[in-house]
């Protein structure tokens, strides 16, 4: 409900390590009419919270069951996605098995990579046979054109080149990166390497499930790099908006289906009310605006779910919620 009310028509969900609850999330997502990739989280290494650690063989078996049962449901817009939590929480055997599973069923893959410098060092120590974090995923068949990796704040030039070569994508999660002081992703540099990039929220790491917030934080991250003279120019608001829409669809390999209003694509849209009674910003009748463009710019900068009156997924109105959900 929260993600739909915030206007998210397509989501990538990390569920839990539990198969049945992950399947339930997929069922609920389908019932609400959202387009989504849902993943059963996999981790067989976890000293911090041992009760979350799975036995490798059981994890693989349960992931296979999750994929099989979800595919059998034949939901029109909800698909399984292979989800190793991240490198340090998985053994090499598990990563390899998950890569085989993704390859066998031609599935999408999601995980985290290079969120903070300590994580990068941990991966180097845990997997010394690999040149870098990206190679760990790549050699285990988890870095493909159907892969989306969150964060990527500390990728090297070589890793960005490998991302581009494989057609893998990055989900930029600036709210989380600021909140956890993980780092600042240089989006301009990523795009210059021809790596697909969309925006994410990393809820639990960040504090907002709103893509509007993700746009604002993306601008802040870009501005901070310009202030510190890392980049000569920052992103424009139009570029940040494109990353949240078409960029996200490209990251998920859905840009032939969604991402903009090109003829033939599915109609995903929000009806925006800039004059909502409880709007977080004010508009005045004397303001001389280019109504459509400027109103949208203000909405993106200052608005929130209170300004979203209706949400449509593939032409079907999903917000306000129907009485059946």
Question: Predicted segments — roles?
Answer:
Residues 266-323:
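C-terminal cap of metal-dependent C-N hydrolases
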Residues 157-158, 164-201:
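A conserved active-site cap/scaffold subdomain adjacent to cofactor or substrate pockets
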Residues 7, 29, 82, 112, ...:
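Divalent metal-coordination and catalytic microenvironments
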Residues 1-4, 30, 164, 191:
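Non-catalytic positions within long, well-ordered alpha-helices that form the structural scaffold/packing
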Residues 9-10, 196:
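Short acidic/polar active-site loop segments enriched in Thr and Asp
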Residues 20-154:
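Metal-coordinating catalytic core of metallo-dependent amide/deamination hydrolases
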Residues 139-146, 188-284:
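His/Asp/Glu-enriched, well-ordered alpha-helical/loop segment
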Residues 41-44, 115, 174-178, 203-205:
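Short, acidic/turn-prone active-site loops that include or flank metal/cofactor-
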């Amino acid at each position: 409900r929260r993600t739909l009310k915030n206007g998210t028509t397509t989501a990538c969900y990390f569920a839990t390590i539990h198969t049945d609850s992950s399947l339930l999330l997929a069922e609920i997502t389908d019932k609400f009419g959202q387009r989504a990739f849902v993943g059963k989280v996999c981790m067989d290494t976890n000293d911090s919270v041992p009760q979350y650690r799975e036995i490798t063989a059981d994890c693989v078996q349960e992931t296979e069951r999750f994929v099989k049962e979800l595919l059998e449901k034949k939901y029109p817009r909800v698909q399984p996605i292979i989800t190793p939590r991240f490198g340090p929480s998985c053994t090499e055997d598990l990563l390899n098995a998950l890569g085989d599973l993704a390859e066998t069923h031609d599935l999408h893959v999601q995980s985290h990579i290079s969120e903070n410098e300590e994580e990068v060092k941990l991966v180097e120590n845990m997997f010394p046979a690999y040149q870098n974090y990206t190679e760990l995923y790549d050699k285990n068949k988890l870095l493909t054109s159907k892969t989306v990796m969150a964060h990527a704040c500390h990728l090297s030039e070589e890793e960005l080149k490998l991302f581009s070569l494989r057609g893998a994508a990055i989900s930029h999660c600036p709210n989380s990166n600021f909140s956890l002081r993980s780092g600042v992703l240089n989006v301009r540099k990523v795009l210059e390497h021809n790596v697909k990039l969309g925006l994410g929220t990393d809820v639990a790491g960040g504090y907002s499930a709103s893509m509007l917030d993700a746009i604002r934080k993306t601008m802040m991250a870009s501005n901070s790099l310009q202030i510190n003279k890392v980049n000569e120019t920052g992103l424009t608001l139009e570029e940040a908006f494109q990353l949240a829409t078409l960029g996200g669809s490209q990251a998920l390999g859905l840009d032939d289906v969604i991402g903009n209003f090109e003829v033939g694509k599915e109609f995903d849209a929000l009806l925006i009310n800039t004059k909502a009674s409880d709007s977080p910003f004010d508009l005045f009748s004397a303001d001389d605006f280019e109504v459509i463009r400027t109103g949208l710019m203000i909405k993106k900068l200052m608005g929130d779910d209170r300004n979203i009156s209706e949400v449509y997924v593939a032409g079907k109105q999903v917000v306000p919620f129907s009485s059946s959900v």
